[in-house]
Amino acid sequence: DIKRMNELDVLVVNGIGHDEFIFDILNATDRKKDIKVIYANKNVSLMPIAGSIRNEKVMNPHTFISITASVQQVYNIAKELGELDPANKEFYLKNARDYAKKLRKLKTDALNEVKNLGNIDIRVATLHGGYDYLLSEFGIDVKAVIEPSHGAQPSAADLEKVIKIIKDQKIDIIFGEKNFNNKFVDTIHKETGVEVRSLSHMTNGAYEADGFEKFIKMDLDEVVKAIKDAAAKKGKK
């Protein structure tokens, strides 16, 4: 990682405490003063992690699992690159505009799928606080988060508390993480009977130029399907 870092001119980070480890690598390089760091979340509106079972007030770093915040990030990166490389400023901005247009269409298409369902109260819990920004695109607030923090195991008391919240709040859907086997979600499903759906965290796998579009569309499609199914159960079609 240090060798690869030494070959960079620019480093783009998410920030907000999500990728602090990268600065240890940066500080270990010979060229740390020469590498420009771009903070993708500069001026992006942040949300606190909703539904924390321990009532912790922490800003949510998962802005990249969304459309609205990701578009802001794209423009931030393009602007910063244009300042570093003025000769190609218009090239970066055009790419940003074209990409933002693609992302906005994905959001529009998803919202059009559920717009005729009317004002329905879809109640959601999540495995961790990774999906607040994505769900907010649909006007959905997260009522409960199972893990105290991403990857942290909830205690028996935490599980008891979240099961009570899910029952009291009449939660319709639990969103877990795709390709992540979590026994706590299974336990909660057995205790509450609430359906579990899976979303991508988009932090692994091979790099592909259109990878973000593919994964975010999969997530949008999964949320749309969950909303439709919940609406059908509530008698709205």
Predicted region positions:
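Extracytoplasmic metal-acquisition and chelation regions
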Residues: 1-237
